[in-house]
Amino acid sequence: MSPQTETKAGVGFKAGVKDYKLTYYTPDYETKDTDILAAFRVTPQPGVPPEEAGAAVAAESSTGTWTTVWTDGLTSLDRYKGRCYDIEPVAGEENQFIAYVAYPLDLFEEGSVTNMFTSIVGNVFGFKALRALRLEDLRIPPAYVKTFQGPPHGIQVERDKLNKYGRPLLGCTIKPKLGLSAKNYGRAVYECLRGGLDFTKDDENVNSQPFMRWRDRFLFCAEALYKAQAETGEIKGHYLNATAGTCEEMIKRAVFARELGVPIVMHDYLTGGFTANTSLAHYCRDNGLLLHIHRAMHAVIDRQKNHGIHFRVLAKALRMSGGDHIHSGTVVGKLEGERDITLGFVDLLRDDFVEKDRSRGIYFTQDWVSLPGVLPVASGGIHVWHMPALTEIFGDDSVLQFGGGTLGHPWGNAPGAVANRVALEACVQARNEGRDLAREGNEIIREASKWSPELAAACEVWKEIKFEFQAMDTL
């Protein structure tokens, strides 16, 4: 008896347990343009066939459960079930497979990343038949993309707001991340912005602690950026972290930032949650605020190669939920990030249409149908010697964020900012003149340091600093 006829009410209820693959493994299925497609890295328990493991993932993340239930006869499983439509072994890995699963669009609430993830990466990750499970990629169909607002403003609108074109934007995370008073914190912000940076940033765990309450920080930072704007003639911003213990408190902080007239606020989207993030993104669009996103907690989810969720999926989810910037790794700094894979999800953040490219970890062609793009933020262990590589790798539509690489300058914060701005302008000019940044990068920085004592001092301090560890996030 076929799985389809078993679920028809006219046949009668047949109790018991049957293999998932009888119903949920459908290798002849032709995917629809409206399906959400998922690529899972599956490691079955010994003795579990890969087809059964893939079917179990499809079942437990859609309509299935561990046994046959009589209420199956009250609906059409063929309409609503997830289907494992293909399985392929992972090259070079024993007992690992990529299982491709198609989900009907009707399974998901419109405009809700929360609901999408609750289904696709919910209970199935604790399933006993699987030794490990990792969601490698999702194809979000245009029909579903169109139910999301996405980033509050996007790349072009941000450039127009800031009146800054033709180069990456420069930022700095204020350090020490915890312990400064609000006034001293604001002083550090002012010095960095006056020196030539476009942005400064609250660190991800700066919320509203006893040593510095959020309202005091917002006031002193607003004073700092307005003073720096008046002195430099450039529009400046500070990422005021609105993350809070409740959505109501988060929105209250964003409202106060808007009343101060600052251009941008910030949110920790994984610890804060997708529902809170989408709510804040909607507020930011309605009220003209840019939204910077920090990915605190991402490595808990994405760093293990065989279990969890790859960051490219979290990046796609952020573009849907809403954010104008997101931290994306550096390739060259202290934090995890392999070049081809990093550039793969950077393209998924910025571009409107991205072709399937397995060499960069992109399992599906993704059409964003004009959903605004997100600026990738390179941050973590970078300094002036990295500037040529960062400019070449990330291009103009990016934010290069130097925390210790600004505040660690031997002459202070403002000279540290000057050094970074001079290095960036030198790299952009050299690139525009046709020079090869990858090959001539060090020479370009040395030439610029001859007429910038601030850059020369920075070059001397960080000439021996390297973070040489093998990346774990490989294909």
Swiss-Prot record:
Q: Where is this site: Transition state stabilizer?
A: K334
Residues the record lists as binding substrate = N123, T173, K177, R295, H327, S379
Note describing how the cofactor binds? Binds 1 Mg(2+) ion per subunit.
Q: What positions are modified (N6-carboxylysine)?
A: K201
- The record lists Mg(2+) as bound by K201, D203, E204
Membrane spanning residue stretches:
none
Q: Listed GO cellular component terms?
A: chloroplast
Q: How is it modified after translation?
A: The disulfide bond which can form in the large chain dimeric partners within the hexadecamer appears to be associated with oxidative stress and protein turnover.
Q: Which cofactor does it need?
A: Mg(2+)
Q: Which reaction does it catalyse?
A: 2 (2R)-3-phosphoglycerate + 2 H(+) = D-ribulose 1,5-bisphosphate + CO2 + H2O; D-ribulose 1,5-bisphosphate + O2 = 2-phosphoglycolate + (2R)-3-phosphoglycerate + 2 H(+)
User: What are the recorded GO MF terms, alphabetically?
Assistant: magnesium ion binding; monooxygenase activity; ribulose-bisphosphate carboxylase activity
EC number(s) reported in the record: 4.1.1.39
Pfam families assigned to the protein according to its UniProt record, in alphabetical order? RuBisCO_large, RuBisCO_large_N
| Cell location | Plastid, Chloroplast
> Superkingdom of this entry's organism?
Eukaryota
Provide the GO biological process annotations: photorespiration; reductive pentose-phosphate cycle
Q: Which InterPro entries match?
A: RuBisCO, RuBisCo_large_chain_AS, RuBisCO_lsu_C, RuBisCO_lsu_C_sf, RuBisCO_lsu_fd_N, RuBisCO_lsu_N_sf, RuBisCO_lsuI
Primary localisation category: plastid
Q: Which keywords label this protein?
A: Acetylation, Calvin cycle, Carbon dioxide fixation, Chloroplast, Disulfide bond, Lyase, Magnesium, Metal-binding, Methylation, Monooxygenase, Oxidoreductase, Photorespiration, Photosynthesis, Plastid
Positions bearing N-acetylproline = P3
> What is stated as this protein's family in its record?
Belongs to the RuBisCO large chain family. Type I subfamily.
Quaternary data: Heterohexadecamer of 8 large chains and 8 small chains; disulfide-linked. The disulfide link is formed within the large subunit homodimers.
Q: What else is known?
A: The basic functional RuBisCO is composed of a large chain homodimer in a 'head-to-tail' conformation. In form I RuBisCO this homodimer is arranged in a barrel-like tetramer with the small subunits forming a tetrameric 'cap' on each end of the 'barrel'.
- Record function comment: RuBisCO catalyzes two reactions: the carboxylation of D-ribulose 1,5-bisphosphate, the primary event in carbon dioxide fixation, as well as the oxidative fragmentation of the pentose substrate in the photorespiration process. Both reactions occur simultaneously and in competition at the same active site.
Name by which UniProt lists this protein: Ribulose bisphosphate carboxylase large chain
Q: Which organism is it from?
A: Populus trichocarpa (Western balsam poplar)
Point out the gene that encodes the protein: rbcL
